[in-house]
């Protein structure tokens, strides 16, 4: 036995006048697990005494059960298999388990496995520990009012009013505009921002803690976006500044209303193929290019539904890694192209060096950044360019390279 297992058994035990685990007791159980220095020994002791199954059966409601499951999955190693088996047995009389609300797309065991894989990846890739974090924006509408600015997760936004849903279905111009990208003239928007405004936006984006669906899978508080971007940059031989620039550009042209529309459409009966989250990753792109490969093992990825993929894209760490992995894919693809067959690209970006894309962006000509920005948002290297977007991303990149920019 351990001190934590003794405490947990006392909190989940029933008596003649105590036939349920209260919310307060459940929170004490979860806190004990999260603060335990020997979690594997505690799980082994609970398993040996027959209390491990009871733990999973008795701690609720679903949001607290998920917190419990994530805390155990993220902290165990030697005893993770035993914990998973106990969880399976606990679901015999409650097959839905934690599948409520947005979690309907994740069977309880899948949720356990995602938390376990994420915790392992965070430790392996160096973004498990929390870092210094900044303050979110309070903007609720207009440019730069989506998750990148506010930290409000798309899955937490209210359902779009039924009247607006009908108007969107009928393509009412005013309603479509309300739920679409807010910027028309990208250059005009940038001209309204001072250098300090741009720095403030960039710092707001990267300084916040990640907006994650799996906070309890981390050993402490979730890490900052800057920390996750830095980890993704190391993994894919990129720079955090390039990842940050791509995301900042996407988030400048994003609103809270559009976040709501894109996510809710993706998980609706239509399963719309929308772009979701920080890097505005398209659901089909995440699936086709297996953009979660470095955070989730193949068994988990293979079992994800399309709506589960859409939901994971709303979680910052998954979106940042998906964005970075796709940037690297587009860059590697460029290094294999023949510039003579891309006359429009060569004309628009005269300093482009396709071979340089195989290496780190620190060694790219600036035109490489601009060209990649165009190809990130469309079919890559088909010689059809995205008007205005290369310079829009380049402006964000310049902000991240500014000496006044603090990248935690």
From Swiss-Prot:
Residues that bind Ca(2+) 1: 181, 253-254, 258
GO-annotated cellular components: extracellular region; host cell membrane; membrane
InterPro entries in alphabetical order: Tse3_cat, Tse3_N
Reaction equations catalysed: Hydrolysis of (1->4)-beta-linkages between N-acetylmuramic acid and N-acetyl-D-glucosamine residues in a peptidoglycan and between N-acetyl-D-glucosamine residues in chitodextrins
Cofactors: Ca(2+)
Domain of life (superkingdom): Bacteria
Designated name of the protein: Peptidoglycan muramidase Tse3
Organism: Pseudomonas aeruginosa (strain ATCC 15692 / DSM 22644 / CIP 104116 / JCM 14847 / LMG 12228 / 1C / PRS 101 / PAO1)
